[in-house]
């Protein structure tokens, strides 16, 4: 049935669900959110999960992959049962946020609190970058938690490198959700500043998101008479798109991995980004395939303006020198080669078999 949240938004509320086996027989029924009828017994969600894990009969040769730690009911059952199987916990997002790094979290990420508290029962954490591994070890140590093995297996990969048949000169691309923390406004203002010195520069913005944020970004473009060289292209497949551009820019405040950074590097784009955790420093190497710019999360209005000018300077430096541009492009391909799908598959095989 349709129900209302406290903020008056609507959601689908569970009234009753019936689950069948392959023979069309009823296995169990769900009444509301936390009541289940199974073989004539009334169970809550914990009881049902407990029954499920008993039926699996896991042993020390089995592997249990845990993802999205915020579902505490799964965690309760898994750790209280002291299952014999190996337990690998995949950390997809940031585990710790300094003041200003995230709009929704500060310090230890509540999503992973349970895992960290019971880390002595975990065989391995899996993170996407070496930088996050180092930081996670430090955070667990600071909070006096046990430190299990920590494996680095990137959450993203590319099947192949995308070789360009020709890039539009002076072209820039950025791609992300249009939300505040991606700081597309910085990208736009930096491009406007750079365009004052090189009127051949163009920027295409791929992605959709919060309408108020998009409206604000479009207003910046319009107020600066930049509609002729800054375009909003919406959400679309970026396959065979990156390689048409010279330069990819990300001003995101935090990237646990940064799949678009990898895709841009795999397409031979030069890269510009802020030196923030963790993906930017993984895919952008200062002077090698782009520019990694120092950043402070507690910035004054004047320092933001200086940052915009600094990014504009880096844009002009890269696009005005074909030798630098070619060097950065070749090195991006070289860096992305480490993230080919078959190489990531080998990393999984190492821990699973």
Where in this protein do the model-derived segments appear?
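Short hydrophobic beta-strand element within catalytic cores of glycosyltransferases
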Residues: 270-274
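Aromatic "clamp/platform" in nucleotide-sugar-dependent glycosyltransferases that forms part
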Residues: 253
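Nucleotide-activated donor-binding/catalytic signature segment of Leloir-type glycosyltransferases, i.e.
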Residues: 215-235
């Amino acid at each position: 049935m349709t129900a209302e949240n406290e903020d008056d938004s609507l959601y689908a509320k569970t009234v009753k669900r019936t689950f069948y086996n392959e023979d069309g027989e009823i296995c169990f029924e769900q009444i509301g959110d936390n009541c289940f009828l199974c073989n004539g017994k009334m169970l809550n969600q914990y009881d049902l999960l407990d029954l499920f894990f008993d039926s699996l009969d896991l042993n020390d040769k089995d592997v249990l992959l845990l993802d999205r730690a915020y579902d505490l009911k799964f965690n309760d059952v898994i750790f209280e049962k002291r299952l014999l199987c190996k337990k690998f916990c995949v950390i997809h997002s940031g585990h710790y946020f300094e003041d200003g790094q995230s709009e929704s979290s500060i310090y230890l990420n509540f999503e992973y609190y349970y895992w960290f508290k019971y880390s002595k029962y975990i065989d391995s954490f899996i993170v996407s970058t070496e930088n996050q591994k180092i930081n996670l070890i430090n955070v667990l140590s600071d909070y006096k938690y046990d430190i299990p093995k920590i494996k680095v297996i990137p959450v993203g990969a590319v099947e192949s490198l995308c070789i360009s048949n020709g890039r539009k000169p002076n072209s820039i691309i950025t791609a992300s959700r249009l939300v505040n923390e991606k700081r597309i406004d910085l990208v736009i203002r930096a491009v406007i500043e750079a365009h004052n010195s090189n009127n051949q520069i163009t920027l295409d913005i791929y992605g959709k998101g919060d309408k108020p944020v998009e409206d604000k970004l479009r207003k910046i473009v319009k107020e600066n008479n930049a509609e002729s060289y800054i375009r909003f292209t919406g959400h679309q497949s970026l396959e065979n798109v990156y390689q048409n551009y010279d330069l990819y820019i990300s001003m995101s405040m935090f990237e646990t991995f940064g799949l678009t950074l990898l895709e841009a590097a795999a397409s031979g784009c030069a890269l510009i980004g802020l030196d923030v955790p963790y993906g930017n420093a993984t895919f952008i190497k200062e002077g090698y395939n782009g520019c990694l710019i120092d950043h402070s999360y507690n910035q004054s209005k004047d320092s933001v303006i200086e940052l915009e000018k600094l990014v504009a300077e880096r844009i002009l430096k890269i696009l005005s020198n074909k030798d630098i541009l070619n060097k950065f492009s070749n090195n991006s391909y070289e860096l992305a080669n480490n993230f080919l799908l078959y190489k990531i598959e080998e990393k999984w095989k190492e821990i699973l078999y």
